């Protein structure tokens, strides 16, 4: 057990003071929280500094805070911003640690069973451990999370009970410490020293915490007493600091013990017996045989190894939960009086609601056809009503709050004025005929003045074709799509801001929270095609991407003006009028937001070759003379042709794209 520090305070560090309507928003939200208001809405137009406002609120109310975001890109962006605002506090990041995840599934129509397949990102796993350990150690914690936070995580009480606490002068046998480390899933490896491992040299035990990747701990014994504890650089072994006390958290969030495991196995075997009788009585002999074979194998693995592939399907027994009871999640690691902030709530809350149903439908097939026991259905995300039961106090943040939030509270705080005096962008509607040539002209105007462009399309095919077309014209362009891995999207947004390319094409990824002040033009293709991506809320969000630049403008390419288009244009005009009046009254001249480009979370290099091309562009090409650059392009073209001759078309295509980018870079 560890002693949690509850007297820390949030220390907001910023060169700016709240301006515009930020002060009244901060005051109203803070007063609402302090008076016990359970749910509030911050209706903040794009670029009005909602993150800064909520940071001020967090600092004033001093509660552990969960920031819930609807995707990893935005979560990564928010993580960087909050880390900058609170450098002296624990700002953590908690998203799914899978680079790739194929869930277990069964398709009856084709009798196809799909095994679970996944690739875990070690960096994100480290950050997840850092988040949970911080929540148990201190109160000044902000966790920026995706909806991964409502998925099963393991019992926080078991996790905390297994923490190994070490102090200088403490009497403990060295071998007892080693056994404790093994119990909390640490591996001994005296050669390959990594997270979640320890190594032993005589009376010295070095432990690499699961929540760190830079510093390890060196515990020095004198007999059966801890003589000294030192924090060391894991790579060089240099001493960083002396420590009087350390808490070693488990290397996994799913902790158990022999008694729990024994009880769980009994429960699994009892359920298997009952389920086999049901299936046999229903004449489902194949399903019964399949279930018996698979479950018996899992039970044998649990008995012998304490682990089996797919152990999460038995989590109900491991946690000691009753049928239907919700699983433990990140929310259970927070104290009861925590503050929840839902970013882009109009998207996040429907996503939270949909998680349970999608998971249930897939697992029900596995249960019905004898691949899993019915208890596997309890390895699931939380239902919306279960999330609501965890909520102590919540602030929903959005420029366009959804019906869920608006139905739950009338306490709406508006924030329309931007601190920089920036106005909502101007909007033009232009005909679809000749739209691409028109768009090329507009792009070139922006490139000449070092500004960026967002283009949003309706289909992946159109986005890809448009990207290829622009590349052929020598325009530096990238395509942001759903196949891009976890945090590589954040890298792309950062590269756009750095000017490594000028145009970003996307489908529905260029709406909420993508924060690029350098973007002065947003082009919306097929704006008159009513639907999810072109409704009023989506259009307002997309328009908002141009609201951080003093030259911000939006062009909608459409042959008719739909009701959604008109409503979005009317709301934008209303806000623009309010903003212009405020600027006139206070003699403010709008200026583009000057925002530092933050460093990336270290996990952006998620695969073996992720970012190789970008690394090449960054480290070598920019430093070459023009003659060297042309020579490099020539060599790459030769490699491209060689790859094509060998029928390695994937490599050839990668080299082709690189050559096109390099040619555009020097043109």
Swiss-Prot record:
Transmembrane residue ranges = none
Q: What does the entry list as the binding residues for ATP?
A: 44-51
Ranges for the UVR domain? 630-665
How does the entry describe the domains? Answer: The beta-hairpin motif is involved in DNA binding.
Record-level GO cellular component terms:
cytoplasm; excinuclease repair complex
Q: Coiled coil: which residue ranges?
A: none
Give the location of motif Beta-hairpin in residue numbers: 97-120
Mind telling me what this protein is named?
UvrABC system protein B
Q: Entry's PROSITE patterns? A: HELICASE_ATP_BIND_1 (PS51192), HELICASE_CTER (PS51194), UVR (PS50151)
Extract the GO molecular function terms from the UniProt entry.
ATP binding; ATP hydrolysis activity; DNA binding; excinuclease ABC activity
GO BP: nucleotide-excision repair; SOS response
Query: Among its keywords, does the record have Acetylation?
Result: no
Residue ranges of every copy of the Helicase C-terminal domain listed in the record = 435-597
Q: Where in the cell is it found?
A: Cytoplasm
Alphabetically ordered keywords of this record: ATP-binding, Cytoplasm, DNA damage, DNA excision, DNA repair, Excision nuclease, Nucleotide-binding, SOS response
Q: Which family does it belong to?
A: Belongs to the UvrB family.
Q: Which domain of life is it from?
A: Bacteria
Primary site of residence: cytoplasm
- Biological role: The UvrABC repair system catalyzes the recognition and processing of DNA lesions. A damage recognition complex composed of 2 UvrA and 2 UvrB subunits scans DNA for abnormalities. Upon binding of the UvrA(2)B(2) complex to a putative damaged site, the DNA wraps around one UvrB monomer. DNA wrap is dependent on ATP binding by UvrB and probably causes local melting of the DNA helix, facilitating insertion of UvrB beta-hairpin between the DNA strands. Then UvrB probes one DNA strand for the presence of a lesion.
Subunit (UniProt): Forms a heterotetramer with UvrA during the search for lesions. Interacts with UvrC in an incision complex.
Per UniProt, residues of the Helicase ATP-binding domain are 31-414
């Amino acid at each position: 057990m560890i002693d949690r520090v509850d007297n820390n305070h949030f220390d907001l560090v910023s060169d700016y003071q709240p301006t515009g309507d930020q002060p009244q928003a901060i005051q109203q939200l803070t007063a609402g929280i302090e008076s016990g208001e359970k749910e509030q809405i911050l209706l903040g137009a794009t670029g009005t500094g909602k993150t800064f406002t909520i940071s001020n609120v967090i600092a004033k109310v001093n509660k552990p805070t969960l920031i819930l975001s609807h995707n990893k890109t935005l979560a990564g962006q928010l993580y960087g911003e909050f880390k900058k605002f609170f450098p002296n506090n624990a700002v953590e990041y908690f998203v799914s640690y899978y680079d790739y995840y194929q869930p277990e599934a069964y398709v009856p129509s084709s009798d196809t069973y799909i095994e679970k397949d996944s690739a875990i990102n070690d960096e994100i796993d480290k950050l997840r451990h850092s988040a949970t350990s911080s929540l148990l150690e201190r109160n000044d914690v902000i966790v920026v999370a995706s909806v991964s936070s409502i998925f099963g995580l393991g019992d926080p009480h078991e996790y905390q009970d297994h923490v190994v606490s070490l102090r200088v002068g403490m009497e403990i046998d060295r071998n007892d410490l080693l056994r404790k480390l093994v119990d909390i899933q640490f591996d001994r490896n005296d050669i390959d020293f990594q997270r979640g491992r320890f190594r032993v040299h005589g009376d010295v035990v070095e432990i690499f915490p699961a929540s760190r990747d830079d510093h390890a701990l060196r515990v020095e014994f004198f007999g059966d007493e801890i003589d000294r504890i030192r924090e060391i650089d894991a790579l060089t072994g240099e001493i960083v600091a002396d420590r009087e006390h350390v808490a070693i958290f488990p290397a996994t969030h799913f902790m158990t013990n022999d008694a729990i495991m024994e009880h769980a196995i009994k429960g699994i075997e009892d359920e298997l017996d009952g389920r086999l009788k049901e299936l046999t009585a229903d004449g489902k002999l194949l399903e019964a045989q399949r279930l018996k074979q698979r479950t018996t194998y899992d039970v044998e693995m649990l008995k012998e190894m304490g682990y089996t592939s797919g152990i999460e399907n038995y989590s109900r027994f491991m946690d000691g939960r009753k049928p239907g009871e919700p699983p433990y999640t990140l929310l259970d690691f927070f104290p009861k009086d925590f503050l929840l902030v839902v970013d882009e709530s109009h998207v996040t809350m429907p996503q939270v609601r949909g998680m349970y149903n999608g998971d249930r439908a897939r697992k029900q097939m596995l249960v019905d056809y004898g691949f899993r026991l019915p208890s596997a259905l309890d390895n699931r995300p939380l239902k919306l009503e279960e999330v609501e039961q965890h909520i102590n106090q919540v602030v929903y943040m959005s420029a366009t709050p959804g019906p869920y939030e608006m139905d739950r509270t009338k306490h709406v705080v508006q924030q329309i004025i931007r601190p920089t005096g920036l106005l909502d962008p101007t909007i033009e509607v232009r005909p679809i005929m000749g739209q691409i040539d028109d768009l090329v002209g507009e792009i070139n105007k922006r490139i000449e003045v070092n500004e960026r462009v967002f283009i949003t399309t309706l289909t992946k095919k159109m986005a890809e074709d448009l990207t290829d077309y622009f590349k052929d014209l020598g325009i530096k362009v990238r395509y942001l799509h759903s196949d891009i891995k976890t945090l590589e999207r954040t890298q792309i947004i950062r590269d756009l801001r750095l000017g490594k390319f000028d145009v970003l094409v996307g489908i529905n990824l260029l709406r909420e929270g993508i924060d690029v002040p350098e973007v002065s033009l947003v082009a919306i293709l097929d704006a008159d095609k009513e639907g999810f991506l072109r409704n009023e809320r989506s259009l307002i969000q997309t328009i908002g991407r141009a609201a951080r630049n003093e030259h911000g403008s939006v062009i909608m390419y459409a042959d008719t003006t739909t009701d959604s288009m008109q409503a979005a244009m009317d709301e934008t005009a209303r806000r623009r009028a309010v903003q212009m009046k405020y600027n006139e009254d206070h003699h403010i001249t709008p200026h583009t937001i000057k925002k530092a480009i933050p460093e990336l979370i270290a996990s952006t290099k998620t695969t073996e070759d992720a970012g190789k091309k970008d690394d090449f562009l960054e480290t070598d090409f920019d430093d070459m003379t023009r003659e060297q650059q042309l020579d490099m392009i020539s060599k790459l073209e030769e490699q491209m042709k060689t790859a094509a001759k060998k029928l390695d078309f994937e490599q050839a295509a990668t080299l082709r794209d690189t050559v096109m980018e390099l040619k555009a870079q020097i043109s």
